[in-house]
A protein has these predicted regions:
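Membrane-proximal stem/loop segments at transmembrane-domain junctions that anchor or position
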Residues: 1-89
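Membrane-interface anchor segments at the N-terminal boundary of transmembrane helices
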Residues: 67-137
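Lipid-exposed faces of alpha-helical membrane segments in multi-pass integral membrane proteins
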Residues: 117-120, 139-147, 161, 169
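Transmembrane-helix signature of polytopic, lipid-linked glycan biosynthesis machinery
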Residues: 125, 141-156
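Membrane-interface junctions at the ends of membrane-embedded or membrane-associated helices
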Residues: 127-135, 169-183
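Short, aromatic-rich membrane-interface segments at the entry and exit
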Residues: 133-138, 156-160
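Hydrophobic/aromatic-rich transmembrane helices and adjacent perimembrane loops
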Residues: 154-174
Length: 183
């Protein structure tokens, strides 16, 4: 396996893809075809930046805000993190002895409830007393959120950072418990 830097799709490609309205900022085959149609890395970077700016200007502030709201739903509304969806169905664990198909609804509902609890805990953490550690954790959370809101949204990008969200949620719940005990 040999890396080919000249053929790489850089950050502007993923920014451009994150601004496509056709798939609410998710993978879009046309964007990939467009990017790889440029023979050099610099031509590709310039074309991606130009198209990203064109999309922002074409949407305007109102449509851009609506687009980002849709991306927030794509990124944060699924506690299963696009289980069995992201990347096609090349591999499935349902229908086997661990996750029989008839329990899929229960499984996905439980995961959704857990994820909503984690997001709720993060919200509680937002109102916790700030210290040096909390600022560091908030910077991590904001960085992850900015990444998935600016660039292509895929469940795997958020899923890789779930421990950060869980830590913030636990600290948020702990802060709430301390406030309740203090009253």
């Amino acid at each position: 396996f040999k890396l080919a830097p000249e053929e790489a799709l850089g950050a502007p490609h993923f920014l451009m893809m994150g601004l496509n309205q056709e798939t609410n900022g998710s993978y879009y085959r046309w964007d990939v075809s467009y990017s790889v149609s440029f023979p050099t890395r610099w031509e590709r970077l310039k074309a991606n930046i130009d198209l990203a700016l064109h999309r922002v200007l074409w949407m305007g502030p109102g449509d851009l805000a609506l687009h980002e709201a849709k991306k927030a739903l794509v990124n944060f509304n699924d506690g299963t993190f696009a289980w069995k969806m992201d990347g096609g169905e090349r591999f499935s664990i349902s229908g086997g002895p661990v996750f029989p198909t008839e329990h899929e609804l229960i499984w996905s509902t439980a995961l959704q409830a857990l994820w909503l609890g984690v997001l709720g805990g993060c919200l509680l953490y937002a109102f916790a007393a700030a210290d040096r550690n909390s600022v560091t954790l908030w910077l991590c959370l904001l960085g992850v959120m900015a990444m998935v809101m600016l660039f292509e949204c895929r469940a795997r990008y958020l899923y890789a950072n779930v421990p950060i969200f869980i830590l913030a949620a636990v600290l948020g719940a702990r802060s709430l418990a301390a406030r309740v005990r203090g009253r």
